[in-house]
């Protein structure tokens, strides 16, 4: 028998076996490397947020190193020390202090590529001077849901355990107002309601101011609270709704953005919207004619949810760190006024 052709075949088979063994060895080595204990991941750098003007005051609060940790945000350094301008990861400017003078901005000293944040919790009706701020800011912090850093005045969070008992209600409706102007829609609606509904009015506008600690317990005595915003704008739902009504344990009667906006934040049966009625007389009749069973349905949400307020500017500014890794560095608001007025 002639075996001349078997030599090359055997050599090829041998090479194939060797290649297979080498492949298995490589796979085994990769598996070992993948399953080996990994080293400690590199710590994430701390983000420094410089607040150029502290809102409504020349004296910023104390800002210890753990300020943002208190709000559940780690590796975030909040400072009002302007000497950090060159090294800060972002600088935030509150609009009220910029409202009349663009010169308050350190434009000449701005490091290249440093994100600047425009911050305001006021409505467009009370925000002026935006036309002077074109092409300056990269991000926006506001109550608008489409803001880069969205900070509402409040929200509902899951809650387990018994809800606090509702205060006893001995009166019908209350309203706390400091700046009463007849041209405002809320003033006109109040004038239309007054002949049909007993509304007790508190605040500087009526010569009956309430101290900060007095407001909630005072309103808690009423079945309804007029949560009338001073102007009606997209997503503009303030403490008049969250604190003055929901925290106080009363039913808010709301004048503000459309019902659908409120329903994005709270259950549909947690409030009364003025748009649901054809006239102030109809609204008053609904409120005064409501039986106790129907009234209690407005508080069904309290069995599973609780109100969380966002009133501290420190917490609001710390939220920048939470969003920082996800925000576009190259974005610029060329027409901040057009965006905010939309």
From Swiss-Prot:
The chain crosses the membrane at residues 15-36. Residues 1-14 are cytoplasmic. Belongs to the glycosyltransferase 10 family. Induction: By T-cell activation. Up-regulated by LIF. Induced by IL1B. Induced at higher levels by interleukin 12 in activated T cells. Down-regulated by IL4. It is found in: Golgi apparatus, Golgi stack membrane. GO terms for cellular component: Golgi apparatus; Golgi cisterna membrane; Golgi membrane; membrane; trans-Golgi network. GO terms for biological process: CD4-positive, CD25-positive, alpha-beta regulatory T cell differentiation; ceramide metabolic process; embryo implantation; fucosylation; inflammatory response; L-fucose catabolic process; leukocyte migration involved in immune response; leukocyte migration involved in inflammatory response. It is a single-pass type II membrane protein. It is an enzyme of class 2 (transferase). Residues 37-342 are lumenal. N-glycosylated. Optimum pH is 7.5. The lineage of its organism: Eukaryota, Metazoa, Chordata, Craniata, Vertebrata. SUPFAM superfamilies: UDP-Glycosyltransferase/glycogen phosphorylase. This is Alpha-(1,3)-fucosyltransferase 7. GO terms for molecular function: 4-galactosyl-N-acetylglucosaminide 3-alpha-L-fucosyltransferase activity; alpha-(1->3)-fucosyltransferase activity; fucosyltransferase activity. Disulfide bonds join 68-76, 211-214, 318-321. It catalyses: an N-acetyl-alpha-neuraminyl-(2->3)-beta-D-galactosyl-(1->4)-N-acetyl-beta-D-glucosaminyl derivative + GDP-beta-L-fucose = an alpha-Neu5Ac-(2->3)-beta-D-Gal-(1->4)-[alpha-L-Fuc-(1->3)]-beta-D-GlcNAc derivative + GDP + H(+); a neolactoside IV(3)-alpha-NeuAc-nLc4Cer + GDP-beta-L-fucose = a neolactoside IV(3)-alpha-NeuNAc,III(3)-alpha-Fuc-nLc4Cer + GDP + H(+); a neolactoside VI(3)-alpha-NeuNAc-nLc6Cer + GDP-beta-L-fucose = a neolactoside VI(3)-alpha-NeuAc,V(3)-alphaFuc-nLc6Cer + GDP + H(+); an alpha-Neu5Ac-(2->3)-beta-D-Gal-(1->4)-beta-D-GlcNAc-(1->3)-beta-D-Gal-(1->4)-[alpha-L-Fuc-(1->3)]-beta-D-GlcNAc derivative + GDP-beta-L-fucose = an alpha-Neu5Ac-(2->3)-beta-D-Gal-(1->4)-[alpha-L-Fuc-(1->3)]-beta-D-GlcNAc-(1->3)-beta-D-Gal-(1->4)-[alpha-L-Fuc-(1->3)]-beta-D-GlcNAc derivative + GDP + H(+). Its EC number is 2.4.1.-. Leukocytic/myeloid lineage cells. Inhibited by NaCl. Inhibited by GDP in a concentration dependent manner, with an IC(50) value of 93 uM. Also inhibited by GMP and GTP. Inhibited by N-ethylmaleimide. Activated by poly(ethylene glycol) by enhancing the thermal stability of FUT7. Activated by Mn2+, Ca2+, and Mg2+. Both panosialin A and B inhibit activity with IC(50) values of 4.8 and 5.3 ug/ml, respectively. Inhibited by gallic acid (GA) and (-)-epigallocatechin gallate (EGCG) in a time-dependent and irreversible manner with IC(50) values of 60 and 700 nM, respectively.
